[in-house]
């Protein structure tokens, strides 16, 4: 992805979904396809605020590959790319 002109807020994370490769040449209707649960972190917010008003930094960073909950976040389209904005708490694991 080239330059991002989106400013992600608070503890939100911008994810570019990574589709799994299909094998066997079977074409499924879009309604039958499994929603991706793997993606790349494109941008992160500054973090939420704790009870003292201090920022709590996020664990993930741009460039991390992650697994996330299947129905997490809100899908958006920006510069003809499908992206998902979700809370960091919807991320299940960072792929090392």
Swiss-Prot record:
Keywords: Chaperone, Cytoplasm. GO terms for molecular function: ATP binding; metal ion binding; protein folding chaperone; protein-folding chaperone binding; unfolded protein binding. Its main location: cytoplasm. SMART domains: Cpn10. One of its GO terms (biological process) is chaperone cofactor-dependent protein refolding. InterPro entries: Chaperonin_GroES, Chaperonin_GroES_sf, GroES-like_sf. GO terms for cellular component: cytoplasm. PANTHER family: 10 KDA HEAT SHOCK PROTEIN, 20 KDA CHAPERONIN, CHLOROPLASTIC. Together with the chaperonin GroEL, plays an essential role in assisting protein folding. The GroEL-GroES system forms a nano-cage that allows encapsulation of the non-native substrate proteins and provides a physical environment optimized to promote and accelerate protein folding. GroES binds to the apical surface of the GroEL ring, thereby capping the opening of the GroEL channel. This is Co-chaperonin GroES. It comes from Wolbachia pipientis wMel. The lineage of its organism: Bacteria, Pseudomonadati, Pseudomonadota, Alphaproteobacteria, Rickettsiales.
